Amino acid sequence: MSEQRIGGTTGSAQIPNRTTHITGWGHEVPAATLTNADLEKIVETSDEWITTRTGIRERRIASKGETTASMGALAAARALAVAGIKADDVDLIVVATLTPDHLMPSTAVLIKGALGSTRAAAFDLSAACSGFAYAYAVAHGFLTAGLGQRALVIGAETLSRSVDWSDRSTCVLFGDGAGAIVLEALDIEAGQDAASRPGTLSFELSADPSGAYALWIPGGVGDGADPLIKMDGAKTYVYATRTMAAVATAAIERAGLTPAQVDLVIPHQANIRIIEHVSKAINYPMEKIFVNLDKYGNTSAASIPIALSEAVAAGRLKPGDVFCTVAFGGGYTSGAFVTRWGADPAHGARAASVDPASIRVVRPEGGAKADEPPAVLQAFLDRRHR
């Protein structure tokens, strides 16, 4: 089956002179760090083996009580603070995740409750590591169709609870965390083209079912299996290098731009070799690609919004800059979007005003399995806190 892509540009929705732009951003990662040296004590591996093959040196691990919803809620609260708005100013909450707290209720609904929102529609979206690009496109469509003015777009994962910690080919790759943005509708002034138009310029999405079981998590209703990540690494690598370059190129072209006109690329943080391959394939310099996977590993749908939040804090984006995000994931799926940055990076300081203790996610009576780290990691966390 040949792979088909869909995409869109500003002005293709029901309100032709409306686009969207990012006005708030934030992220949350657990305090507990699992280094490659720590992993040497869990599985047969080494820091040298992991670093040279992936670029990952450490990853963050959720402790007891930290969940996809709790991290997503904190990231979202910071994004709201940066945007200078309240939870009830938001019309839509979309959470991209493959590790929800529960099958039902959705993580988005739990986050809505934690934020104190009373009016937003809320739902989860599953497109694996491409999830944030998909969620962005959905929120963009919602807003440009005139269904609302603002959306929270969140990517959040606790992959440490979906990893087989005896499988050294996968357990070294993944980490936990969450990132969020506030996306707002923006009217386009007459006569603006891609060279000057603010906000979202294009997006590109694809799905290829030929790789459905090259990267997957069993354990669905009626499956009867443990929900642990399984991956054909070689097959996934080939797909990732091919599709990320193709999707990024398509999104940039759809925006009416060339790679030379893009100021920053923020890729899904899966593997440094994949990122370097994409850099060469689209003839784009590595120094203009934001990389933080050495600190966090692969956080799936959370990787792009975490990287975006850190890129702004690092001074890598200023008003007028064009950036492109690109991702691939299980399914297979892939996605990219191109945006011209317009927000004041100094607004990021507002995130510090959020009191984590004020953001509480409701839990079921007696707790839930989603609240607990795997036993092998709990022992590690216990030693760290002695």
Report each predicted region and the residues it spans.
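Condensing-enzyme catalytic core mediating Claisen C-C bond formation in acyl metabolism
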Residues: 2-64, 167-242, 246, 341-386
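Claisen-condensing/thiolase-fold acyl-transfer catalytic domains that form or cleave C-C bonds
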Residues: 3-7, 69-80, 99-100, 113-114, ...
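Short beta-strand segments
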Residues: 23-26, 96, 126, 151-157, ...
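Acidic-glycine-rich active-site phosphate/pyrophosphate-binding loop
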Residues: 43-52, 102-116, 153-159, 217-222, ...
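Glycine/charged-rich beta-loop-alpha catalytic/anionic-binding loops adjacent to active sites
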Residues: 56-60, 89-94, 113-126, 160-166, ...
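Anion-binding (especially nucleotide phosphate/pyrophosphate-binding) glycine-rich loop
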Residues: 82, 86-118
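Short glycine-rich phosphate-binding loop at a beta-alpha junction
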Residues: 88-96, 259-268
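Flexible, glycine-rich active-site loops centered on histidine and acidic residues
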Residues: 142-178
